[in-house]
Amino acid sequence: YLYREGYIDANPARGVAPAKVERKLPQILTSKEVELFLEQPECTDAKGYRDHAMLELLYATGIRVSELIALDIGDLNLPAGFIRCSSSKKERIIPLYHGAVKALQDYIKGVRPQLIADTEETALFVNMNGERMSRQGFWKIIKHYQEKAGIQKDITPHTLRHSFAVHLLENGADLRAIQEMLGHADISSTQIYTHVIKNQLKDVYQKAHPRA
């Protein structure tokens, strides 16, 4: 202020690097918590089959909620076991595990035709009125199953995305491959998950080592 107003000749703050803001590590679910969460939808009616397919797909691919609800039926290639995800920047091809393929097949063949209001509807996931699922609608679904599972962590759609990345890293996946699947433009966005794993190891050490 003093320099800008002309009270002093030099700016003493010039060249001083701004303080680094510590990046908060994302919250993730353990593998057991994910399994419990994915078990919550009951495949006894249309809603249960749809919700099960959505949650399996979200964890199988790590896509964003905006990408999930934007998926069209033509973005799936279930025989080959992958989905095509088109973001604003580029297209990604992401593989699916068998359980996600099965959940999607059950939904598409047996449930989606009952839900869509218009046979020309292209949306993969629709609400109970037959229209494309909204972010708010999916958020409510996530919260419902969090409460049903009794998981104390605050689960959001992004929690499954974070968990997807960390679990792949824990099991030896290449960081660049994870970056590609997540659609990160910068590898530094993906590297944050390595810090999560380091923190987990430190917690395990502190709890288990007799001299910690």
Regions found by a protein language model. Give the residues of each.
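Conserved catalytic core of the tyrosine transesterase superfamily
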Residues: 1-212
